[in-house]
Amino acid sequence: MADTTSTSKGTTSQTISDTAKAAEEFLSTLSDEQKEQVFYNYDDETKSTSWSNFPVTFVERSGIKLGDLGETQRAAALKVLKALLNDEAYAKVTGIMAGDQYLKDNANASDLGDTQYNIAFFGNPSTTNDWSIQFGGHHVGINATFSNGTITFAPTHLGTQPTTYTDSNGQTQSALGDMYQTAFDFYNSLTDEQKQKLYQGEEVKNLTCAPGDTCDYPTGTGIKGSELTDEQKQLLLKVIANWTNLADSQTTQATMDQISATLDDTYVNWSGATVYDTSQGKGIYFQISGPKVYIELASQDNDAGATVSGVQTSGWGHIHTIYRDPTNDYAGSVTQQKSSGPTGGGPGGSGSGGPGGSGAGSGGPGSGNGGPSDAPGRSGAPAGAPGAPGGKPGDNESGQTSSSTSKSTSKSATADS
């Protein structure tokens, strides 16, 4: 297979060791009450629904928010992420967060920003026992599970808005630009006959499998891997590596080997633009679906209320993606539960109450029917920990009013420090 791995780190065992050490150092900066917020049992099903494309103000996350930490604590939390990810992936995730801060600063999006991200541990950090990290907020949902000496990043959500912008230093930023480029490298390698099988029409579809929700892993549509040349297969693997090449080279190689072994039975389909020209059209949608991989990318035909003059924040400029392993999400530690809150991020207009919006529209933040007055808090959480949010979020990102995001979580009350 093609070399799609990072050279910045070497082995899975080293990543596990470095990440566990960084996690312990982060925990040493926290109070007992803060530790209680961070810890969950390894098999707590909360992990299956507490990641999303939505901001944390719309979908409650597990763990503790970076914005609720002191400067030293926040730096220690990010060191956990840096120990886990390779250099390219760390830059990708922090680049997404920087884009969120850009929207806060330039689009009056008060519920966004680079501190609106949560970190949680499911199980105790260890080099031998199973545990997992969940890190997420707007357009980020990292689920890294350490099990039996392996690391899996399925499922993971990565998105971005805006896809490309100029920062305060005059530098062009594009956290997920490689996703578009590698996709078109693959598309342009196909013959006309192959493109006819691949292409599903002009409509840019939304994600079929939303972050933090159940998924039926549809397959069988488009072109089959066995119909590709060896060169085309390598280009397809480079597309897939945007999601699988997140940690050390050994971890990436192990995942890619499994995907490569079943690539002939993997289908790819595509809709939307057929030329990589961000000045035209509304972007693209593609789906890669096989025995060991499920990936979707969908450009979003809405800016969710985050408008910046002269900057694309919808269409090409707003991306949602999903990566899952149909056989090994969360390393089998939990069964995916159905989301009780908003999901997806459809191509339907800007939506009332989006980031930076007034929230005055139907279903805006704080409107709608609130949850029950006795909405449960987190079992085992510190005394006085807040219960689940009562009001319904607005239609930020999805173009639809959603059900309440209230949920009960079963937390570990015996987490080691």
Regions found by a protein language model. Give the residues of each.
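A cross-kingdom marker for long, charged
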Residues: D3-D32, E36-E71, A75-N86, Y90-D374, ...
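Extracellular mucin-like PTS domains
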Residues: T401-S412
